Structures are given as structure tokens and as C-alpha cells.
From Swiss-Prot:
Zn(2+) binds at residues 64, 68. It comes from Streptococcus thermophilus (strain ATCC BAA-250 / LMG 18311). InterPro entries: SprT-like_domain, SprT_Zn_ribbon, Uncharacterised_SprT-like. The lineage of its organism: Bacteria, Bacillati, Bacillota, Bacilli, Lactobacillales. Keywords: Cytoplasm, Metal-binding, Zinc. This is Protein SprT-like. Residues 6-141 form the SprT-like domain.
Amino acid sequence: MNLTDYVKTVSIEDFGWKFKHQALWNKRLRTTGGRFFPKDGHLDFNPKLYEEHGLETFRKIVRHELCHYHLYFQGKGCKHGDRDFKDLLARVDGLRYAPKMRNQAENYFLYQCQSCGHTYRRKRRVNTQKFGCGLCQGKLIFLNQS
């Protein structure tokens, strides 16, 4: 699929306005579906979201980025909090947030108290030499990373 041609098609069909710049795939994007660059007007899109969620969801992501694009060049509010942006996004049925990707699941560090057996899940590592169990002040041992 030629991405720029696809974005031009979505722009004409869903907005009635022309897309005059370039659309590119960007493999480095991790948590976002796409980005708009006001300096030169091009759009970047996350190819992993297209592969994982399909064309229907990807089209909604394209609509979201095109809302930024068209509002910026019309001189209207193009940021997420602006009323113009919210109204246009609702009108074209674009996604407000990018869907979570499969490999973006939360990772936790698991620790267990040697004395009472209480288990702790933490997003950040815990220094087991310095910190102990909050219930019995026993020694914590690292179990694994989930």
C-alpha cells in the first residue's frame, strides 16, 4: 500500500479537503499511532499498529492525524484540548487515543517476603538490601519480572 496515496484518499473521502504533503512509516514510534509535523507538514505513522489492529483502526488513526493537519493549515486550534479539534475528530469518527499494542503490556517486578510470604508487584526495581517488608520488616527476595 502506498501510504501517501492512502492518506490522500482518506482526506478527500472523510474531510473533503486535499492532503498536499507526504505520509511516511516510522518504525521507531512505540506508543503513538502517528505524528504530525507542522514545520514541513508531513505525517508519520506506526506500521506496527496497522499490522496488529488492521485497516479499519488504522483509518481512524489517519483521521486523527489529518485533523491536526487540516486544522493547523486552516489556522484553527489543532491541539488535543482545543474545541475545534474535538469537534472535527467527532465529526469524522477518528480515534481519540491509539489502541494499546500487544507487546506494550505492563511489566512488573515481583518480590516476596521471606518471613510472612507477602508478595509485592512493583513497576520499578527495589533495592532489597535497603528495603524490607512493610508488614513484618522481613527480608525481601526478588522472584522474577512478569
